[in-house]
Amino acid sequence: MKFFDREKEIAEILHILNREPDDVYFIYGPINSGKTALINEIINNRLDKDKYVVFYFDLREIFISKYDDFIEVLFEEYEGNKKPVEIIKSLIKDVPSLCGIPAPKNTLEEILKKKTTKNVFRYITKVLMDIKKEGKQPILIIDELQKIGDMKINGFLIYELFNYFVSLTKHKHLCHVFCLSSDSLFIERVYNEAMLDGRAKYLLVDDFDKETALKFMDFLAKENNISLTNEDKELIYNYVGGKPKDIKYVVEESNFKDLKEVLDYLLNDEISKLDMFLEILDYSKPRVEVGNEVIEINKEDIIKALRLFKDKYEIPKKDIPTPVYVYLVKENILFLNPQKRILKPQSYLVWNAIKRLL
């Protein structure tokens, strides 16, 4: 399928890339809002391949629990006497981005043996500087960064990474750094992190607004040779809102199924999930960590919080006690925008399930 819209976000990211690196950028948004698709569109179709070298690390693809896993994500081993920059130059002729930084076998063995991030970062910096000397601008993109949020290597790895990213951008102006995440609690933690104050920027990739969602339906209908009336499009939006993945599923399924049947199937599925979530709370009391305290959550407090969404899609964060919204965000029922300090359901389907069930 052709890429649709996001021209505003694309223009902003290209504008950032045309400047000297100076900030770490965090790209966040609800689940399935199109963050990865946006970045892939930029990497594959919008960048001058003669000007940029992109390293794209997708952490969702690898289970990371120890130092060796982290190294496996970052590096691609090779044998021979070629310099890493020569390997990179030969690779980027054929692919738009690299999924690891080339490292000679003996160098990689040494990095694995010493088990310190200092050696890792020193090697990466050397490679990035060599790329810069070749007249190209390196870009690091880390997708689902929160996967290493609690991992420790001589202290929390994430803080060492933040310091390193700040060094690459704010201090050395060497490399653009973009971190993607759909974990809004992680983004809230990052947003309030003192070491990143004045050194990081945040880009929200949200679900489509109504106008764009309706245009997306027209686009998909044309792509799939489907006829959608205005009433059909309004019905789709009322059920799934502007969630690109949900809209795509509904339009494509409606090619050979009744539209209302497809929509009711999705909604009933979401209602069943929410019902089960609430039923489990009759038998267990979840706990969440807030600061240095572990707080127990009551079912009554969760229901009270969810009922606030009966008549509103968005509410101020302060309207729900912190432990309760933390739990609901962890369970992917709510999404938190830390910049605007608002909470909303992860999707229109979740919102409709809340309204039907409560």
UniProtKB/Swiss-Prot annotation:
Question: What family classification does the UniProt entry report for this protein?
Answer: Belongs to the archaeal ATPase family.
Q: Which domain of life is it from?
A: Archaea
Name of this protein: Uncharacterized ATP-binding protein MJ0074
Q: Which GO terms describe its molecular function?
A: ATP binding; ATP hydrolysis activity
Organism for this UniProt entry? Methanocaldococcus jannaschii (strain ATCC 43067 / DSM 2661 / JAL-1 / JCM 10045 / NBRC 100440)
Concerning PANTHER family, the annotation shows: ATPASE DOMAIN-CONTAINING PROTEIN (PTHR34301:SF8), DNA-BINDING PROTEIN-RELATED (PTHR34301)
The residues that hold ATP are: 29-36
Report keywords, A-Z: ATP-binding, Nucleotide-binding
Recorded hits in SUPFAM superfamilies, A to Z, give: P-loop containing nucleoside triphosphate hydrolases
